[in-house]
Amino acid sequence: MNLRCRICGDEGEQARFEAREQMFGWGDRFPYFLCGRCGCLQIEQVPADLARFYGNGYYSYGSPAYRNALTAWLNGRRDAWAIEGRSAIGRWLHRRRPRQDLLSLRRLKPGPETRILDVGCGAGHFLYALRERGYTRLLGVDPFIDAEIRYPNGLVIERKDVAAVHGEWDVVTFHHSFEHIPDQQATLASAARLLAPGGVCVLRLPVVQSEAWRTYGVDWVQLDAPRHLYLHSVDSVRALAQQAGLTLEAVQHDSTGFQFWGSEQYRQGIPLRDPRSLAVNPASPLFSAEHRAGFERRAEAANAAQAGDQAAFYLRRV
């Protein structure tokens, strides 16, 4: 069957797949296809009732505020290592509780005056950590929060879409929000419009060119049908970037062991939100400590081979 790719426009014969909703275990089925030209795996038709598949608690809108002074200090050390490569104890803390979102900024060498816009930010956990590190020129936007959020530290999260944002920004980030957006071209064009000359858009996304997709197929946990409308490849992100007047400058794989244990659970018929799931009960006996450590080592190897199931894409305005 010939289907038109919504990323590159290819209308050739496309490989088709049927994916199930597996996070909540509802089992609804959705057809996807893999573009033969750009390699983007995409849902054939965006469900008219897409909102109902998010359910209660899909996103974490809880406050990112630190519970006490000790937590704030420990998180500060960890975050200093993630962003700036400083703090020996921070490196150790980061291995225990990683912040890949913050780590994605390191190659950009940001400073307190760097203007950073985060799109689809929820409660603003990413920006809150930056604000606590002394960054002041920050804004988060998300059209799905109930109302504007103002934190005591000065961070503001506005209830709006990126198309409604004004001003000029050095960095625009999408941390696992872009794959949920139906109109990919218009959204990236809006982000590109906001970038200062030489500015960078950082897209952190699931990647279909991955060991996890090759191994698990439609049981790959980050396929996440029907919420993930697009599972990109390097070529499909490059095509989108060119359409928006941006240049794909670098790709940094940052996948974790989740791609393996989550997919193994799906193969066993265990939804991500099931009481037996590691996502719900970290002490679950589903996988031994040895197995979990093996999943993390496997993820590190996949990242090194550019085959991890998620990555940060750096798109520069030139």
Language-model-detected regions and their locations in the chain:
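Conserved N-terminal segment of class I S-adenosyl-L-methionine
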Residues: 1-175, 184-188, 253-254, 282-287, ...
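Conserved catalytic loop of SAM-dependent methyltransferase domains
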Residues: 19-23, 249-283
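Short low-complexity, flexible loop/linker segments enriched in glycine and/or proline
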Residues: 31, 153-157, 218-219, 263-268
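Feature marks short, surface-exposed loop/turn motifs that line or immediately flank catalytic pockets
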Residues: 147, 208-211, 255-257
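Histidine-centered divalent metal-coordination motifs
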Residues: 176, 180, 228
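A short glycine-rich, Lys/Arg-flanked "PGG" loop and its adjoining helix->strand segment in the class I
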Residues: 185-200
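Short, glycine-/aromatic-enriched active-site segment of Class I SAM-dependent methyltransferases
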Residues: 201-230, 235-240, 266
